[in-house]
UniProtKB/Swiss-Prot annotation:
<dbReference type="InterPro" id="IPR027417">
    <property type="entry name" value="P-loop_NTPase"/>
</dbReference>
<dbReference type="Pfam" id="PF00006">
    <property type="entry name" value="ATP-synt_ab"/>
</dbReference>
<dbReference type="InterPro" id="IPR004100">
    <property type="entry name" value="ATPase_F1/V1/A1_a/bsu_N"/>
</dbReference>
<dbReference type="InterPro" id="IPR033732">
    <property type="entry name" value="ATP_synth_F1_a_nt-bd_dom"/>
</dbReference>
<keyword id="KW-1278">Translocase</keyword>
<dbReference type="InterPro" id="IPR038376">
    <property type="entry name" value="ATP_synth_asu_C_sf"/>
</dbReference>
<dbReference type="InterPro" id="IPR020003">
    <property type="entry name" value="ATPase_a/bsu_AS"/>
</dbReference>
<dbReference type="GO" id="GO:0005524">
    <property type="term" value="F:ATP binding"/>
</dbReference>
<feature type="site" description="Required for activity">
    <location>
        <position position="374"/>
    </location>
</feature>
<dbReference type="InterPro" id="IPR000194">
    <property type="entry name" value="ATPase_F1/V1/A1_a/bsu_nucl-bd"/>
</dbReference>
<keyword id="KW-0139">CF(1)</keyword>
<dbReference type="GO" id="GO:0043531">
    <property type="term" value="F:ADP binding"/>
</dbReference>
<dbReference type="GO" id="GO:0045259">
    <property type="term" value="C:proton-transporting ATP synthase complex"/>
</dbReference>
<keyword id="KW-0547">Nucleotide-binding</keyword>
<keyword id="KW-0066">ATP synthesis</keyword>
<keyword id="KW-0375">Hydrogen ion transport</keyword>
<protein>
    <recommendedName>
        <fullName>ATP synthase subunit alpha</fullName>
        <ecNumber>7.1.2.2</ecNumber>
    </recommendedName>
</protein>
C-alpha cells in the first residue's frame, strides 16, 4: 500500500486552491413565485429599483412597480405566457428607454418603439428614458406663438399656443379624434413635428387614421405610437410616456412638436387594472390613489422651454431658439359627465378644454364645440393679430344666441334688436360648421369672419351660408391671391387689409351667385 506524504497532500491542496476559478457573474437574480394576468411576483432581487427593467428567460422583459419587503411585483412588457414559477429573473440596472429622433417620423411603432408598419427597421441613433422629469419653472417660457388647428371654432374662440396643454373632452362619437387628426393635418406648412399616441383603440380604427395621415401627406412629419386594445395593459400604460419622450427630442433641440394622446381615459383604465392586480388599495371609482400623478407627470412634460435651456441641452449647438411640446390629451366622458374622477383630474391639470357635446353633434353642428364651457387659459396671448382682432365678438354672439334661443321658444313677439341678435347668432353658428379633413388657413378664416363681423351675412339665407363660404373663398384665391398670401405670411391686421377685405366681399356679393 502506497504511503501518502503529508507534505505532498498539503502541496496538492494548495495547488487546487490556486487553480480554483472564483470568478462569478455579479447578477442580482431572483425566482418567479407567481405569474398571473401579466403580473409577476419575484422572490429575491433585493437591489431592484422602482421602474427598473427586469429580464426573464426567453428574452422577455418586465418593469418593477411594487418593491415589497421580501418580493418584487413586476409588470410584463409583452407576452407572459412563456413565464413559469421557478424561472430566474435578473436585474438589468437600466430604466426603460425608447428610440428617439427624426428617423421615427413617418413610422408606426409600438409602445416600446419597435416598428410595426412593415417598412423595415428604424435606425435611430439615440434612445431616451420613457420616464423623465418635466422642465423646471426657470427653464420655461410663456406661451406666445400659435398652433393653428385649422378649425374656425377653435382658432377664434379657444386658441391653442405652442407649449400649451389643451384637453379635448366629450362623449364617444362626438368628433374628438377627428379634431385631433385635423390639427395634425393642419401643421403641414408650420414646421411642427407631430406624435399621435393611440391607446386602447381597435386596430381597424388606428389603420384608418394612419391611412388618412398618409393620404394627406401628414405622416411624413408624424410618428404614430400604437398600444391597441388587444395589447397588454402594461403597454397601454407605457405608450403615452414613450410618445412624450419622442416629442421631447424635438422640444429640447429648439424645435416645435405636437402630441395627441388618444385617449387618456383608456390609459387610466389600464393603470387601474395593473394596480388592482398588484394588490394596491383602490380609491374612488376603484382607481389607485396616484392616478392624478399618472396624468400630471405626463402632461407637465408638455411645455415651452427658453433659449437658455435649449442651448445648455445641445451644448451650445442650437442658440437663440426656444422649443415647445404642445399636448392635446383626449378624455372620453360617459353621458356628458365631466365631474367624474379622471375628467376632473385632467381638466385641473391642463390649460383649458374643448368640450364636444353629443346633442350639438347630432343636430349637425360639427365640430360640436360647446362655446360656453370650452376655454383656453393661455392661448389668447398666442393668437395671431388678425384672428385676435376679428374673433372678439364671436364667442359673445354665440353665447347670447344660445341664451336668447332658449328664451325665444316661449316668447311670441320679439323686439327688433332681439330678432337681429338671433339672426346673427344663427349665421355665426352656421359659419362655425366645418367639414372633416378640411383645415382652413389664417387667411381663409380671416376672410369669412370679417364678412360675418361686418354684417354682410345678414342678407344671405342661413341654409346658403356654407355654399357662400365655399364660393367666396374660391373667388378670393382667384381674384385676391396676393391679399390671401399677405395675410398668411404676416397675420397682421390694419386699415389697408380691412379695406381690401371690405371691397372684396362687397364685389363678390354684387357680382356672384352661389
Amino acid at each position: 500500500m502506497q504511503q501518502l506524504n503529508p507534505a505532498e497532500i498539503s502541496q496538492l491542496i494548495k495547488q487546487r486552491i490556486q487553480d480554483l476559478d472564483t470568478s462569478a457573474t455579479a447578477k442580482n437574480e431572483g425566482t418567479i413565485v407567481k405569474v398571473s394576468d401579466g403580473i409577476v411576483q419575484i422572490h429575491g432581487l433585493e437591489d431592484a429599483m422602482y421602474g427598473e427593467m427586469i429580464e426573464f428567460e426567453g428574452d422577455v422583459y418586465g418593469m418593477a412597480l411594487n418593491l415589497e419587503q421580501d418580493s418584487v411585483g413586476a409588470v410584463v412588457l409583452g407576452d407572459y405566457l412563456g413565464l413559469q414559477e421557478g424561472q430566474k429573473a435578473y436585474c438589468t440596472g437600466r430604466i426603460l428607454e425608447v428610440p428617439v429622433g427624426p428617423e421615427l417620423l413617418g413610422r408606426v411603432v409600438d409602445a416600446l418603439g419597435n416598428p410595426i408598419d412593415g417598412k423595415g427597421p428604424i435606425n435611430a441613433k439615440l434612445t431616451d428614458k420613457v420616464e423623465k422629469i418635466a422642465p423646471g419653472v426657470i427653464a420655461r417660457q410663456s406661451v406666445d406663438e400659435p398652433v393653428m388647428t385649422g378649425y374656425k371654432a377653435v382658432d377664434t374662440m379657444i386658441p391653442i399656443g405652442r407649449g400649451q396643454r389643451e384637453l379635448i373632452i366629450g362623449d364617444r362619437q362626438t368628433g374628438k379624434t377627428a379634431m385631433a387628426i385635423d390639427a395634425i393635418i393642419a401643421q403641414k406648412n408650420s414646421g411642427i413635428k407631430c406624435v399621435y399616441v393611440a391607446i386602447g383603440q381597435k386596430r381597424s380604427t388606428i389603420a384608418n387614421v394612419v391611412r388618412k395621415l398618409e393620404e394627406t401627406g401628414a405622416l411624413a412629419y408624424t410618428t404614430v405610437v400604437v398600444a391597441s386594445a388587444s395589447e397588454p395593459a402594461a403597454l397601454q400604460y407605457i405608450a403615452p410616456y414613450s410618445g412624450c419622450t419622442m416629442g421631447e427630442y424635438f422640444r429640447d433641440r429648439g424645435e416645435d412638436a405636437l402630441i395627441v394622446y388618444d385617449d387618456l381615459s383608456k390609459q387610466a383604465v389600464a393603470y387601474r387594472q395593473i394596480s388592482l392586480l398588484l394588490r394596491r388599495p383602490p380609491g374612488r371609482e376603484a382607481y389607485p390613489g396616484d392616478v392624478f400623478y399618472l396624468h400630471s407627470r405626463l402632461l407637465e412634460r408638455a411645455s415651452r422651454v427658453n433659449a437658455a435651456y435649449v442651448e445648455e441641452f445641445t451644448n451650445g449647438e442650437v442658440k437663440g431658439q426656444t422649443g415647445s411640446l404642445t399636448a392635446l390629451p383626449i378624455i372620453e366622458t360617459q353621458a356628458g359627465d365631466v365631474s367624474a374622477f379622471v375628467p376632473t383630474n385632467v381638466i385641473s391639470i391642463t390649460d383649458g378644454q374643448i368640450f364636444l357635446e353629443s346633442s350639438l353633434f347630432n343636430s349637425g353642428i360639427r365640430p360640436a364645440v360647446n362655446a360656453g364651457i370650452s376655454v383656453s387659459r393661455v392661448g389668447g396671448a398666442a393668437q395671431t393679430k388678425i384672428i385676435k382682432k376679428l374673433s372678439g365678438g364671436i364667442r359673445t354672439a354665440l353665447a347670447q344666441y344660445r341664451e336668447l334661443a332658449a328664451f325665444a321658444q316661449f316668447a311670441s313677439d320679439l323686439d327688433d334688436a332681439t330678432k337681429q341678435q338671433l339672426d346673427h347668432g344663427e349665421r355665426v353658428t352656421e359659419l362655425m360648421k366645418q367639414k372633416q379633413y378640411q383645415p382652413m388657413s389664417i387667411a381663409e378664416q380671416a376672410a369669412v369672419i370679417f364678412a360675418s363681423n361686418e354684417g354682410y351675412l345678414s342678407a344671405i339665407p342661413v341654409e346658403k351660408i356654407g355654399a357662400w363660404e365655399e364660393a367666396y373663398l374660391r373667388y378670393m384665391y382667384d381674384e385676391q391671391a396676393d391679399l390671401m398670401q399677405e395675410i398668411n405670411d404676416t397675420a397682421n391686421y390694419n386699415d389697408d387689409i380691412a379695406g381690401r377685405l371690405k371691397s372684396s366681399v362687397e364685389t363678390f356679393l354684387q357680382n356672384h351667385t352661389f
